[in-house]
Amino acid sequence: MKIPVDKSRIPSGVSLFDKITSVEIEKEDLFKLGISKHEVPAEHVLETDYLYLLSKVSAYIQLYSDFITVNGNQIVNCSTDDRVMKDVSEIVGIALGLKLTIDCFGIRQENISKIPPPASKQKYLDYKFAHKRKNIELETKGTTSKYISKFI
């Protein structure tokens, strides 16, 4: 599916998004990217967090695939349970945010890592990666309020 980028939401003077007019993503990619929201156990046996999470994607698809419908360039949350609606919203929001980041910066998913929560209860961003000798942190959004509703 091809989702157009809403340029009206980008602050003026930010040229990073100039070359991106749309994001192309398949339904399965929503799960491959959306699974990044999960914590990786400290004692996992695979060599990278990315490989650990990738090994869980098929289970993730089995759990949530029936609640996501793709119609053209629309993604529909088909759940009626508010908890599942929130999970689906987070999966889609995180996946689209990471996909846009991957396309804009020309990086691979395995180069993005989740930022662990700080010891103190302060705010922090979700993910980080290195690009051109700079450390970049980003925030993705899956839910927009405490009251989740269906999205199209």
Identify the role of each PLM range.
Residues 126-146:
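Conserved catalytic cores of phosphodiester-cleaving nucleases, focusing on short active-site segments
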Residues 102-127:
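A short acidic/basic microdomain associated with nuclease active sites
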Residues 9-11:
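N-terminal, intrinsically disordered, low-complexity segments
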Residues 17-99:
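Interdomain/boundary linker segments immediately adjacent to catalytic/signaling cores
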Residues 1:
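Acidic/aromatic/glycine-rich contiguous surface patches that form carbohydrate-binding/processing clefts
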Residues 109, 151-152:
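Acidic, metal/cofactor-coordinating or nucleic-acid-engaging core segments within structured domains
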